[in-house]
Amino acid sequence: MGDWSALGKLLDKVQAYSTAGGKVWLSVLFIFRILLLGTAVESAWGDEQSAFRCNTQQPGCENVCYDKSFPISHVRFWVLQIIFVSVPTLLYLAHVFYVMRKEEKLNKKEEELKVAQTDGVNVEMHLKQIEIKKFKYGIEEHGKVKMRGGLLRTYIISILFKSIFEVAFLLIQWYIYGFSLSAVYTCKRDPCPHQVDCFLSRPTEKTIFIIFMLVVSLVSLALNIIELFYVFFKGVKDRVKGKSDPYHTTSGALSPTKDCGSQKYAYFNGCSSPTAPLSPMSPPGYKLVTGDRNNSSCRNYNKQASEQNWANYSAEQNRMGQAGSTISNSHAQPFDFPDDNQNSKKLAAGHELQPLAIVDQRPSSRASSRASSRPRPDDLEI
C-alpha cells in the first residue's frame, strides 16, 4: 500500500474550515479507514491470490476462477472508495485556498488605497467595494474565512457528493461480493476441463473486516446526512435573522414612520425632530407640521393644519386690531408648502411677522373686569 501522508496532510487542513460534523467525519476517515486499511486489512488480504487453490492441475484454471470470483480486490476497492469520498472535500479545500488568495489580493489593494487616502485622494467608494467583496467571499475582519455565500454552497455540494459516493460504493460492493465471503467457490470456465472447486484462505477473518468497513461506511453516510441538515437549517436561520447580507439595501422608499432623519416629515406619524426649526410666522406654542408634498395623505393633513394655523393667526390679528395685516379676511386659503428658499424670499419681500402671544379666549368674569384698569384694544371710547 502506498503512503497516505500526502492525502492526510491535505485533509488535515480542512479541519479549520469544517463544521463539527465535518471534523468527526474526517476523524472517522483517518482512524477507521486509512489507518485500519494500511495496517490490518492489507495484511489480511496480502496472500489472497497466492492462497487461492482449486482442485485441478490445469494451467491457468486458478487464475480465471480467481478473476471470476473477485473482479477487484477488496483492498483496492476500499482504496478507490476512500479516494472518491475524499475528492469533494479536496475540492472544497481548493475553494478555501482560492478565497484566501483573494483575501491577500484585497488586503494588498486596500493598503494601497489607504496610502492614497492619506495623500488626500477620495477612495471611500473603492474601500467600500473591497469590504463588500470580502463579505461576499466570506472573509471576516480578523482574516478568518467564514462559511457563507459561495463557500457555503461548495461545502453543501461536497457533502452531497460524498453521500452519493458512499451509497454508490456500498451498492457496488453488495453487487460484486455481497457482505460475506464463502470458504468454497465453484468455477466452470475455460480453460478448466470441468467444474472445479476453489478454496479461499481465512474467509472468516476477511468477513469480519468486510462487516467492519461496512459499518464505517454507514456511519460516514449518517454523519454526512446529519451535517447536511445542520448546514441547511443553520443557513436558513442566519437568513431569517438577517445575517446573510448586511450590505443588502432595499430598493423601496422608506416609510415616513421610519425615516425620521429627514427635514420634511409629518410628526403625527410617529416621528419627531427636536432640531427642526419652527416656521417664522407661527407663534410660540404652535406646531406647524410639514411633510413631503409627494405623499397625498401627508399633504391633505398639512393643508388642514395650515388652514387652522392661518385661521388662528387672522383671528388674533383681528382681536389685536392691527391695521394693514397681511391677512385680509378671517378665512385662510389653503396652500401647499413651498421650499425653504421660497419662504425666505417671501418673508424678505413682505412685512416681517411678529410672534403672537397666546390669548386666553375664555370670557373674563365681572370681578376681574372691574378690577382691571388697563385699557383694552376693543374698549369703546366715550
From Swiss-Prot:
Q: Which residues lie on this side of the membrane: Cytoplasmic?
A: 2-23, 98-155, 229-382
Record topological domains on the Extracellular side: 45-76, 177-207
Query: Polar residues: which segments have biased composition?
Result: 317-332
Recorded superkingdom: Eukaryota
What is a single molecular function from GO for this protein?
A: tubulin binding
Which residue ranges does the record annotate as region Disordered?
A: 317-382
Main function: Gap junction protein that acts as a regulator of bladder capacity. A gap junction consists of a cluster of closely packed pairs of transmembrane channels, the connexons, through which materials of low MW diffuse from one cell to a neighboring cell. May play a critical role in the physiology of hearing by participating in the recycling of potassium to the cochlear endolymph. Negative regulator of bladder functional capacity: acts by enhancing intercellular electrical and chemical transmission, thus sensitizing bladder muscles to cholinergic neural stimuli and causing them to contract.
Q: State the name under which the record lists this protein.
A: Gap junction alpha-1 protein
